Design a protein with these regions (language model features):
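Peripheral, non-transmembrane regulatory/ligand-interaction domains of membrane transport proteins
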Residues: 1-222, 226-229, 233-243
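Transmembrane helical bundle of ABC transporter permease
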Residues: 254-261
C-alpha cells in the first residue's frame, strides 16, 4: 500500500495513488509504504531514483548498519515502533530514507518509510497532522513527529502497567491469595514485565535514531530543540521503567512467598 502525503495549508493531505503517473503529478513530503507490492516499490524507485534495500525491515541487521548516509546524500534510519495489543506486545521495524542535500534527485525533501504492517503511531500522526495546522512544515518534521508520538504511545503503555500493578498490589497486601489466583497473577505480571522491557528497549532505539538526526546536522534550530525535548522525555520514561521493574520484582517475590506459605500449610495438614 502506498500512502502519499502532500502539504496543504499547513496540514497533511493523503493522496490516492493508483499508477505511476499519479506520482509524477505530486510534490509530496512523505511517501509511506506499508507492505508495498513489487509494483509499488518499482514505481517509487523509478520515479524518485530511490534505492530501497532488500532487507529494509529486516530484524537481523547489525546496529552499526541501521543509521548511515549514502554517497548520494540519502540518509537511512531503521527504528523500532511499539505495538501494544491486548493479546501481545511487539516491536515493528520501520526503515526511513531521507534526502535533504542532493537537489538533483526527485527524492530531495521527501521522507520515505517502509514497514510491514499497520502501526498505531502512524495512524496517530496522520490524524493529528490533518487536524492541527502548522504541525508539519517539512519531511524532517514528519520523522520527528513520528518519534515524538512513539514516546507518547510508550508512555501510555507504561501508564497501563501502573494501573494493572496497582490492582495486583491491593490483592497482595490483603494477604488472602489462593494458589490458583497467585498463578494467574504471576502470568499477568510476567506479561507486564515483558511489555515494560519492550518499552525500555524501544526507547533506547528511539534515542539512538533521534541522536543520529542531531549529529547529522540535518535539523534547523527549532527542530533541534524538538529533538532535545524528545530525548528529555525518553530520559523521564527510563526512570519509570526502572521503577516498574523494581515493583514487578517485589510483587513476584511476594506472590512466590505466598505460594510457599500455602504449600507449607498443606504439608503440615497431611503430616
Amino acid at each position: 500500500m502506498l500512502n502519499v502525503f502532500t502539504l496543504s495549508n499547513g496540514r497533511l493531505v493523503q493522496v490516492e495513488i493508483d499508477q505511476l503517473s499519479d506520482l509524477e503529478q505530486l510534490q509530496p513530503i512523505w511517501v509511506d509504504m506499508e507492505s508495498p507490492t513489487r509494483e509499488e516499490k518499482r514505481w517509487v524507485k523509478q520515479h524518485y531514483g530511490l534505492s530501497i534495500p532488500e532487507d529494509a525491515t529486516g530484524e537481523d541487521i547489525e546496529e552499526s548498519a541501521r543509521f548511515y548516509e549514502e554517497d548520494n546524500g540519502e540518509q537511512h534510519i531503521r527504528s523500532d515502533f511499539l505495538i501494544d495489543d491486548e493479546d501481545e506486545s511487539r516491536s515493528v521495524r520501520v526503515a526511513f530514507i531521507l534526502n535533504q542535500r542532493n537537489t538533483e534527485l526527485k527524492s530531495c525533501g521527501v521522507l520515505f518509510s517502509i514497514r510491514d504492517e499497520d502501526i498505531p503511531v502512524f495512524r496517530l500522526l496522520r490524524m493529528r497532522a490533518r487536524r492541527v495546522p502548522g504541525l508539519i512544515d517539512d519531511a524532517k518534521d514528519v520523522l520527528l513527529a513520528l518519534f515524538d508520538a512513539d514516546v507518547e504511545y510508550s508512555a501510555d503503555a507504561l501508564e497501563g502497567i501502573y494501573d494493572d500493578l496497582k490492582k495486583v498490589s491491593a490483592q497482595v497486601l490483603e494477604g488472602s491469595i489462593t494458589d490458583t489466583y497467585a498463578q494467574e497473577v504471576l502470568a499477568d505480571i510476567a506479561w507486564q514485565e515483558n511489555l515494560n522491557g519492550r518499552v525500555r528497549r524501544n526507547m533506547l532505539d528511539t534515542r539512538r535514531a533521534v541522536s543520529f538526526m542531531m549529529r547529522s546536522k540535518m535539523l534547523d534550530a527549532e527542530q533541534f530543540e524538538d529533538a532535545r525535548q524528545i530525548l528529555r522525555d525518553i530520559e523521564s520514561l527510563d526512570s519509570h521503567t526502572q521503577f516498574l521493574f523494581d515493583k514487578i520484582n517485589f510483587l513476584m517475590d511476594a506472590l512466590v512467598g505466598f505460594l510457599n506459605i500455602n504449600q507449607n500449610k498443606i504439608i503440615k495438614i497431611f503430616s
